[in-house]
Amino acid sequence: MSVRLPQSIDRLSSLSSLGDSAPERKSPSHHRQPSDASETTGLVQRCVIIQKDQHGFGFTVSGDRIVLVQSVRPGGAAMKAGVKEGDRIIKVNGTMVTNSSHLEVVKLIKSGAYVALTLLGSSPSSMGISGLQQDPSPAGAPRITSVIPSPPPPPPLPPPQRITGPKPLQDPEVQKHATQILRNMLRQEEKELQDILPLYGDTSQRPSEGRLSLDSQEGDSGLDSGTERFPSLSESLMNRNSVLSDPGLDSPRTSPVIMARVAQHHRRQGSDAAVPSTGDQGVDQSPKPLIIGPEEDYDPGYFNNESDIIFQDLEKLKSRPAHLGVFLRYIFSQADPSPLLFYLCAEVYQQASPKDSRSLGKDIWNIFLEKNAPLRVKIPEMLQAEIDSRLRNSEDARGVLCEAQEAAMPEIQEQIHDYRTKRTLGLGSLYGENDLLDLDGDPLRERQVAEKQLAALGDILSKYEEDRSAPMDFALNTYMSHAGIRLREARPSNTAEKAQSAPDKDKWLPFFPKTKKSSNSKKEKDALEDKKRNPILKYIGKPKSSSQSTFHIPLSPVEVKPGNVRNIIQHFENNQQYDAPEPGTQRLSTGSFPEDLLESDSSRSEIRLGRSESLKGREEMKRSRKAENVPRSRSDVDMDAAAEATRLHQSASSSTSSLSTRSLENPTPPFTPKMGRRSIESPSLGFCTDTLLPHLLEDDLGQLSDLEPEPDAQNWQHTVGKDVVAGLTQREIDRQEVINELFVTEASHLRTLRVLDLIFYQRMKKENLMPREELARLFPNLPELIEIHNSWCEAMKKLREEGPIIKEISDLMLARFDGPAREELQQVAAQFCSYQSIALELIKTKQRKESRFQLFMQEAESHPQCRRLQLRDLIISEMQRLTKYPLLLESIIKHTEGGTSEHEKLCRARDQCREILKYVNEAVKQTENRHRLEGYQKRLDATALERASNPLAAEFKSLDLTTRKMIHEGPLTWRISKDKTLDLHVLLLEDLLVLLQKQDEKLLLKCHSKTAVGSSDSKQTFSPVLKLNAVLIRSVATDKRAFFIICTSKLGPPQIYELVALTSSDKNTWMELLEEAVRNATRHPGAAPMPVHPPPPGPREPAQQGPTPSRVELDDSDVFHGEPEPEELPGGTGSQQRVQGKHQVLLEDPEQEGSAEEEELGVLPCPSTSLDGENRGIRTRNPIHLAFPGPLFMEGLADSALEDVENLRHLILWSLLPGHTMETQAAQEPEDDLTPTPSVISVTSHPWDPGSPGQAPPGGEGDNTQLAGLEGERPEQEDMGLCSLEHLPPRTRNSGIWESPELDRNLAEDASSTEAAGGYKVVRKAEVAGSKVVPALPESGQSEPGPPEVEGGTKATGNCFYVSMPSGPPDSSTDHSEAPMSPPQPDSLPAGQTEPQPQLQGGNDDPRRPSRSPPSLALRDVGMIFHTIEQLTLKLNRLKDMELAHRELLKSLGGESSGGTTPVGSFHTEAARWTDGSLSPPAKEPLASDSRNSHELGPCPEDGSDAPLEDSTADAAASPGP
């Protein structure tokens, strides 16, 4: 041969130059002659592989369509790889870019850490020289060439010095594998090329230029840089071997499948060359045997090109169903399919008709978007809320779903990128990529391959749990049907198909026990043969007929399947041994790859250990053989899977078979046994896999084996004759099948519970793996639960024994789901399910910390009876079972004739099932909430409250969250001011709202403050804990995501919190739950747990001198009633105060956009009697919430509506009355005198504040509250007047409930404080003693101010309200106690109070009234009037549903009178009692005593209860009329 042949060999050997010596690389023989191609054009194509370094790829490109290398960074990755300026880029990663835009080329280059470029540039001889110049080694080393005799048939060994040394045992880096593969492949290419060269005549036709270099730094772990130049042969040689010029060969994205086939192609080309050629350094050449493969004209370049393009973009994938099927197989087995399935279903929705899109939209919501959806996809919450809203309203959701698709796209693109990485490693054939080779652009063939891929998908689906597999199957069917691809039916519809699918049904119902089959059946034999050939496929879902057409092209006598990196590497390491495989010997485990890619016959070939593999792998294989010998029952078909998993586990420790996390991030499908999954992650844990498992099988397998169902028990039609089925209607057949499914799945569930008991619970208890407390949480009452289901299964068996057709099943259902049996089931199930999530978290922690427990869990979960399910999957089976009962019963009802007793009973059983499920869900929720509260309590930091001066927060310094029940929690933003917001985690407890601020791991309880409106220096402090019986909830009109919480406590001024939710739906949820919690807290205030440090009872004791009400509440108003109310509170308007009883209306006004929040506060309701503008505003802030706690009665709503009507009447008529302005002016004057603050803005103390320092003398205050003629009959009228309005029990915000006597105590305190403060009071005009009650007419309000009638003492029509003024500066402390509830004494009337007298004496009133300023009051009234109307409308709507009951109630209330206490919630009974003269106390009782005892006596103070009330029941009853 010519001397140039060794040069050629040497040129190609530079591919593996990692181990070459420097002289070798710099030998002068490397200079080459130009090829034919380069002679004509002067340009050659070459391929380079560039690895990105810290500076990127190190080159820039320019141009469009013709993309050129613009610049190369000196010393960068591109320069090391041999890229030159001016080179034209022909291909990127095997993709032709001659017609691609500049941006597309850049995108392709940046798609990974490696890029393979095919460049067209000037003759590379200069590059070869420059490359040599970079090598510092001396040149001119002599070359030794010799002719070596032919070696045996296997490929020759590369030069000894180029063989890499032993690799570290645990080195998993992908780059090292890739380097090793490329080296070995390229060495073989050298030899193959030498076979080819003689075929093409003289040396002039041999490649004279071009080289393939792979330069790596010494000690580098991977393929850092390299320059690849493929031989450029003559035109005919390039045509024959086009693959040689394709960068796909050495691109990081090239599959070893292609490499294997290229090698085979070359072997075919050179198989007839028998003349040995010379080689350098001992390289041998020998003739090759003729091997004919199935693909003579295979062009891997074209295939790689096309597939690379398709697997880059989802849009292209959608247009190629076969490629999409391959990608789906990867997604279903190695990643989360939810985003892709959601995207595809949304695509169908976009193109569906309106009718179809409505139903499909709901399915998409239920499967992908709902909170508990089985395939939940994460999209922005606002987008999710918008989709929900549109679907609920049957609106078109195409636009928002399109946005949701875009939100899911990044995750899908990441999965596509991961799959491309898998293809780079040669793993594409695992997912059926080999089938794509046969497409050839034939649409029919494309459809067939797609259907084949989807059939394989069905087998993968069968290994998922049913709650995931069913929706995944639905989504897949939806899209494929839309694309016109026929998908394998999950549940065949006709009888024959059902019979065929019976053995496979367990794949779709993982809880179904596998069926027993007689050992002599043909299916058994087929299954055994199948297992012998492919044992690993038992647990990764091998289809009945292989769905992958893989080609077996041996590269050496030891056959290696394409697509398995581990075996390819192992194969090349074993090449030097030339040993034939020993049949039947143990082979190395190959991880989770299907074995039909690794073996083609029933014999198992051993892949011997490589040079760098330790003996550890052999020891582990011995142990894995032991694991196969564990005893098992004949029905235990999954034992082979467990043994295979053990081998899988052991094989991972070999360095030659280890893969990096990048190469196989998830080396096994999601359905692989847990032991197999964990073993690859932690191979060191596999040392005792055969110790506990056999012991378990010997002890417990006998108990488990009896749980297997009878043959074909899962298919009802297999249990009855064809003649029986033929005589039934289709509806009855369907009904029997559903009943049979109920029976079979119940038996399967019972079996699962026994597995939990025998394999986990009993062993954990026996081996003390968990403390008893923890074990009791994980399995609290497992034996009881098993007994319940066992007894039901026995009843089902008895029913089944009666005959093949079950006529009636309702009695059996009711026996389990109704009556005492239902109570038993729901209690036991709730107890079992409550702590599961908590216990599973505990198990997770123990597995991380305790290796012994970790080993136990691995062994137990790998037990075949667990059916590849983990403990967390098994333990939730009870909860899953409870959800399936209503569905199964619904299906039975659907196929049962309506109107029959059977149908009715089944409907009842279904409803009871739903109640059981609801009960258990609530129990689980409450338990988890308690657990979370315990965690929050540990992180709670309330130190800031200890330093806070806020009285509201003081009592929560030692707040204990665990003593309360949590209703809801979530993030909210608190708008403290326009410029200040705070992110909170808010807890809604049964009686409190807690605003927590997160700081690191702590949850802070911290008071915040802001400047109060109206004063630049004073600040208002907000407590982070709010009592629900003192709050109101209102929406923010200008922000649909925000709502107000108005807190009204006696401990401080009213406060408004503006909280903002993430979405409007979140806000609605918060408001609904808050309102419900407020109702419950005000209805049952005693039920809420008391604070750890309740307020001191000191101030309350003196107030309770009189008889106390039967219901005692620890209310702020009760505790702190004696404290004068703060001066710092801004005031309200007089008109607002006028309607004192209407605190609900006032409280519900926060949405008004007045001057500021303080204005809203001023409008808040106050439980006191005074309606003075300023006083009322101030007062409202504190007392309101105290007035709320009252039991809820239906009549309370009616009373509230009556009060609204009455207040509305007075609000409307007040400004029309001639004395209106006088009252206002009179009200302002005394207030100015009494308080330093502006009369209309604020007051230092409230008329209703007990013991206020500024009370007027008794006479003065009494005058304010009394009418003109009261001097003679003062006690009755005063009492009545005060009681009538002030002491009407306040009603709750939502229902208008009247407060019980306790509220009256508060009001009494308030009244006394009003007098003390000298503030205004609004009282109802009372009739003079002995006068007749005049029925109130709507017009009677006009006569209210008329004092002349009252002066006579005989006429007082309607409910007349007057503003009572303090007489002057507070004189005596005794007057404080004068509650407004106690009537003022006649002598006190004249005492300096000109205002009351004008009211009482019409003549005097009129002149004074004009002097007052009505405009502000009128303006204020407008808002209140409209708000009152709104509230009244709401209440009347609610009253419509109980109109009849309301009328009866009015009748009963109208005629009722009580002597001692007023029934809580009854306005009319109170009125009746007040008008009852027999109850009136002595006429001249001191006011002081009244004020002190009034709040204990009920709705009215002692005096007030006796005073006749002018407002009759008739009046009250006449006004509402819903």
Curated annotation (Swiss-Prot):
<feature type="modified residue" description="Phosphoserine">
    <location>
        <position position="1458"/>
    </location>
</feature>
<feature type="compositionally biased region" description="Pro residues">
    <location>
        <begin position="1091"/>
        <end position="1100"/>
    </location>
</feature>
<dbReference type="GO" id="GO:0001664">
    <property type="term" value="F:G protein-coupled receptor binding"/>
</dbReference>
<feature type="region of interest" description="Disordered">
    <location>
        <begin position="1084"/>
        <end position="1141"/>
    </location>
</feature>
<feature type="compositionally biased region" description="Basic and acidic residues">
    <location>
        <begin position="1112"/>
        <end position="1124"/>
    </location>
</feature>
<feature type="region of interest" description="Disordered">
    <location>
        <begin position="128"/>
        <end position="175"/>
    </location>
</feature>
<comment type="function">
    <text>May play a role in the regulation of RhoA GTPase by guanine nucleotide-binding alpha-12 (GNA12) and alpha-13 (GNA13). Acts as guanine nucleotide exchange factor (GEF) for RhoA GTPase and may act as GTPase-activating protein (GAP) for GNA12 and GNA13. Involved in neurotrophin-induced neurite outgrowth.</text>
</comment>
<dbReference type="InterPro" id="IPR001849">
    <property type="entry name" value="PH_domain"/>
</dbReference>
<feature type="region of interest" description="Disordered">
    <location>
        <begin position="490"/>
        <end position="555"/>
    </location>
</feature>
<feature type="compositionally biased region" description="Polar residues">
    <location>
        <begin position="1236"/>
        <end position="1245"/>
    </location>
</feature>
<feature type="modified residue" description="Phosphoserine">
    <location>
        <position position="245"/>
    </location>
</feature>
<dbReference type="InterPro" id="IPR016137">
    <property type="entry name" value="RGS"/>
</dbReference>
<feature type="region of interest" description="Disordered">
    <location>
        <begin position="1223"/>
        <end position="1320"/>
    </location>
</feature>
<dbReference type="Pfam" id="PF00595">
    <property type="entry name" value="PDZ"/>
</dbReference>
<dbReference type="InterPro" id="IPR036305">
    <property type="entry name" value="RGS_sf"/>
</dbReference>
<keyword id="KW-0175">Coiled coil</keyword>
<dbReference type="InterPro" id="IPR000219">
    <property type="entry name" value="DH_dom"/>
</dbReference>
<feature type="region of interest" description="Disordered">
    <location>
        <begin position="200"/>
        <end position="231"/>
    </location>
</feature>
<dbReference type="InterPro" id="IPR015212">
    <property type="entry name" value="RGS-like_dom"/>
</dbReference>
<dbReference type="GO" id="GO:0007186">
    <property type="term" value="P:G protein-coupled receptor signaling pathway"/>
</dbReference>
<feature type="compositionally biased region" description="Pro residues">
    <location>
        <begin position="149"/>
        <end position="161"/>
    </location>
</feature>
<dbReference type="GO" id="GO:0051056">
    <property type="term" value="P:regulation of small GTPase mediated signal transduction"/>
</dbReference>
<dbReference type="GO" id="GO:0005737">
    <property type="term" value="C:cytoplasm"/>
</dbReference>
<feature type="modified residue" description="Phosphothreonine">
    <location>
        <position position="254"/>
    </location>
</feature>
<feature type="modified residue" description="Phosphoserine">
    <location>
        <position position="2"/>
    </location>
</feature>
<feature type="modified residue" description="Phosphoserine">
    <location>
        <position position="1480"/>
    </location>
</feature>
<feature type="modified residue" description="Phosphoserine">
    <location>
        <position position="1155"/>
    </location>
</feature>
<feature type="modified residue" description="Phosphothreonine">
    <location>
        <position position="1462"/>
    </location>
</feature>
<dbReference type="Pfam" id="PF09128">
    <property type="entry name" value="RGS-like"/>
</dbReference>
<dbReference type="GO" id="GO:0005654">
    <property type="term" value="C:nucleoplasm"/>
</dbReference>
<dbReference type="InterPro" id="IPR044926">
    <property type="entry name" value="RGS_subdomain_2"/>
</dbReference>
<keyword id="KW-0597">Phosphoprotein</keyword>
<dbReference type="InterPro" id="IPR036034">
    <property type="entry name" value="PDZ_sf"/>
</dbReference>
<feature type="modified residue" description="Phosphoserine">
    <location>
        <position position="16"/>
    </location>
</feature>
<dbReference type="Pfam" id="PF00621">
    <property type="entry name" value="RhoGEF"/>
</dbReference>
<keyword id="KW-0832">Ubl conjugation</keyword>
<dbReference type="GO" id="GO:0030010">
    <property type="term" value="P:establishment of cell polarity"/>
</dbReference>
<feature type="modified residue" description="Phosphoserine">
    <location>
        <position position="251"/>
    </location>
</feature>
<dbReference type="GO" id="GO:0030036">
    <property type="term" value="P:actin cytoskeleton organization"/>
</dbReference>
<feature type="modified residue" description="Phosphoserine">
    <location>
        <position position="1300"/>
    </location>
</feature>
<feature type="coiled-coil region">
    <location>
        <begin position="444"/>
        <end position="470"/>
    </location>
</feature>
<dbReference type="InterPro" id="IPR035899">
    <property type="entry name" value="DBL_dom_sf"/>
</dbReference>
